């Protein structure tokens, strides 16, 4: 049986037994916060528990490395929607130690892309269109500096309100310990 079939089979039972009822909440975050975190599997349950968050408390936006790499990309758009449409009054950027994004390179990514059957012509077309793969697959050396950079992009976005604090934290994916990098109340 495929993973998709397993999911659909589980979902059928989940909905028939009305398991969803214990998760019902509104679309507005009770704690009025949006969190940008990494998509690392170790954080799926650890991060909310380490922050004492429950379903409905916050908006969680996930990206590789918790990076805001483009001020007008989908991550920044999601943060702006959380603030203006969903009543988030604070934003947290949460990176983590041992992040895979600190280890990737555009060269390695392109090799893996080609190994999966994507022809060189497509890659060249993308390059010709102006995409800089080194920038697009940007990694980092320091998670703390990376978090500060993402906080800076958010805070200085021309559409981001000045009165909304943007915090930066780093979580240990083994213990859940949070280290404060940027206190948005002080900026």
Curated annotation (Swiss-Prot):
Amino-acid positions noted as binding Zn(2+) in the UniProt annotation, renumbered to this chain: 38, 40, 96, 99
Catalytic activity: hydrogencarbonate + H(+) = CO2 + H2O
Residues passing through the membrane, by range: none
Domain of life the protein comes from: Bacteria
Positions in coiled-coil regions: none
Family matches, as InterPro entries: Carbonic_anhydrase, Carbonic_anhydrase_sf
PANTHER family, A to Z: CARBON DISULFIDE HYDROLASE, CARBONIC ANHYDRASE
Family (UniProt): Belongs to the beta-class carbonic anhydrase family.
Function of the protein: Reversible hydration of carbon dioxide.
Protein name: Putative carbonic anhydrase YtiB
Gene this protein is translated from: ytiB
């Amino acid at each position: 049986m495929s993973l998709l079939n397993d999911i659909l089979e589980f979902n059928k039972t989940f909905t028939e037994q009305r398991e969803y009822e214990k998760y019902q909440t509104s679309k507005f975050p009770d704690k009025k916060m949006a969190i940008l975190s990494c998509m690392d599997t170790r954080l799926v349950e650890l991060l909310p528990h380490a922050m004492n968050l429950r379903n409905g408390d916050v908006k969680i936006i996930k990206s590789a490395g918790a990076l805001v790499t483009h001020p007008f990309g989908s991550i920044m758009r999601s943060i702006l929607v959380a603030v203006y449409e969903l009543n988030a009054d604070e934003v947290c950027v949460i990176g983590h130690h041992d992040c895979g994004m600190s280890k990737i390179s555009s060269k390695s990514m392109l090799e893996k892309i080609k190994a999966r059957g994507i022809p060189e012509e497509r890659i060249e077309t993308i390059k010709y269109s102006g995409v800089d793969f080194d920038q697009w697959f940007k990694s980092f050396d320091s998670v703390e500096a990376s978090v500060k950079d993402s906080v800076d992009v958010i805070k200085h976005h021309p559409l981001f309100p000045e009165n909304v604090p943007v915090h930066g934290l780093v979580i240990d994916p083994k213990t859940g310990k949070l280290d404060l990098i940027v206190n948005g109340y002080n900026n």
